[in-house]
Amino acid sequence: YQCDWSSDVCSSDLIQIPDTLYREEMAKQGVTLPPLGEYGVGMIFLPKEHASRLACEQELERTVRLEGQVVLGWRDVPVDVKLPMSPTVQMTEPFIRQIFIGRGRDIMTTDALERKLYVIRKTASHAIQDLHLKHGKEYFVASMSARTIVYKGLLLANQVGAYYQDLQDPRTVSALALVHQRFSTNTFPAWELAHPYRMIAHNGEINRSEEHTS
């Protein structure tokens, strides 16, 4: 038996939205982003299978519009496809895109936009699973926020910056970085299970409140 150690580690970075990078990259598509704090970015793990991916994207866009917000556009997240990975990691590697969401007329503050993005994320995720797509389970939102963005995966800590080319770009500037690496001991690792999640990082030992009061 040979241990595939490279598929037992999940790593990630949570940083502030790199506004300059995103603004300049979206401008190449003819998209002018609103001021920082008036748009949100979703980091979306999508199925590689085209039909399922398209259905996921369309359902997410539908939810954004139903919630009164604006779909500004999509961006393919540049990754190093030549980065050495084990077959297990490559087999589960998602297609990664970002959706840019502008605030609607009913949203007056960044806090209100954050709450609306939460509703969009949860509503769309449930709606997509209700479609019973062949690869619908591969849809996952790593983050959706007007303040922060999460770059994560089934990667070693020293691979995150190499895999996600945005993290090598000098336009990526952040006053904070929440970095995490976890060796999986009691759960099977996966791209979507890498920490940090959208607000925190932990080692999987958050137990029920009853365990702390009994």
Where are these regions (language model features)?
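Short, well-ordered loop/turn elements at secondary-structure boundaries
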Residues: S6, R171-S174, L193-P196, I200-N203
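Flexible, glycine/threonine-enriched loop-and-boundary segments that flank and lead into catalytic domains
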Residues: F183-L193
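Active-site-proximal flexible loops/turns
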Residues: T187, S209-E210
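Extended, hydrophobic alpha-helical segments in both membrane/secreted and soluble proteins
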Residues: L178, I200-S209
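N-terminal-proximal low-complexity accessory segments that begin disordered
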Residues: Y1-Q2
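Short beta-strand scaffold segments in enzyme catalytic cores
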Residues: S12-Q16, R198-M199
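Extended, highly charged
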Residues: L14-A175, V179-Q181, T185, S214
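Short, small-residue-biased leader/transition segments that mark boundaries at the very start
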Residues: S6-S11, H212
